């Protein structure tokens, strides 16, 4: 079973590390090409392209400039411990033990605009380059064209290595668009998290993101390998709703607190 999650805009390079183990990202040659492209942008261009403040644009222009492909624990950090958004609040990788990291390294992948695909222990230098950004590059008009089949091929390699054919899609639409489902050698399962609001169940972005992290942690902690095991997910008040679920879309609901 391979779990896919999105990266986060918020990064943490200060907190104590839960592990000293690390690996190197596998697609750095491609990342380097994107960095060369991004370095041609001025801070005001970055601000317009990404829709961010001048201060953030300056920070990211500096990050692009400082980025260099020789990653060490001194200039980079394991991806699963560097990302700090809502998904990662639910995941709480900072509390993983060695066996959790082992399972995650085999079964969890983070999709990334700059790095393509990251394993949890892959070192990563700080960046901001969201998958949906229209950064023109030698391969096309945006990052989807840049990555083409590369991300899908890398996921197929991971599936081959672990010997099963199930992908649990816990990534956002923006990021999952970088995967070619028809070329993926796997059964696709998408958990959906609905929260009750004024008597109606709907996707509430903040809660849904955190729930994706909670589900990822649930799979890792319990070493789950079969799709039918996912329906037991019951963290923080969620329950499986068999009636509205299908074989490839598992619906989890939570009553208003």
Curated annotation (Swiss-Prot):
Any Gene Ontology CC annotation: cytosol
A GO biological process held by the record: response to hydroperoxide
InterPro entries: YaaA
Pfam families attached to this UniProt entry: H2O2_YaaD (PF03883)
Species the sequence originates in: Salmonella schwarzengrund (strain CVM19633)
Name of the protein: UPF0246 protein YaaA
Family: Belongs to the UPF0246 family.
């Amino acid at each position: 079973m391979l779990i896919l999650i999105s990266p986060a805009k918020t990064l943490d390079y200060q907190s104590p590390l839960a592990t000293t183990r690390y690996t190197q990202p596998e697609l750095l040659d491609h990342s380097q090409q994107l960095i060369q492209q991004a370095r041609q942008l001025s801070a005001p261009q970055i601000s317009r392209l990404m829709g961010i403040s001048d201060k953030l644009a300056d920070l990211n222009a500096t990050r692009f400039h400082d980025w260099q492909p020789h990653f060490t624990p001194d200039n980079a950090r394991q991806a699963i411990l560097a990302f700090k958004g809502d998904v990662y609040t639910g995941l709480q990788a900072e509390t993983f033990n060695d066996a959790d990291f082992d399972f995650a390294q085999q079964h969890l992948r983070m999709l990334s605009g700059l790095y393509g695909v990251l394993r949890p222990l892959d070192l990563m230098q700080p960046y901001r380059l969201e998958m949906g950004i229209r950064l023109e590059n030698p391969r096309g008009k945006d990052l989807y064209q840049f990555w083409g089949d590369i991300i899908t091929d890398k996921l197929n390699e991971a599936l081959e290595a672990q010997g099963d054919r199930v992908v649990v899609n816990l990534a956002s639409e923006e990021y999952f668009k970088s995967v070619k489902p028809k070329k993926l050698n796997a059964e696709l399962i998408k958990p959906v998290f609905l929260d009750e609001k004024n008597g109606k169940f709907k996707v509430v972005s903040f809660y849904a993101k955190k729930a994706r992290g909670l589900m990822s942690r649930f799979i890792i902690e319990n070493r789950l390998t079969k799709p039918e095991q996912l329906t037991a997910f019951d963290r923080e008040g969620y329950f499986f709703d068999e009636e509205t679920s299908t074989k490839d879309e598992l619906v989890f609901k939570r009553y208003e607190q």
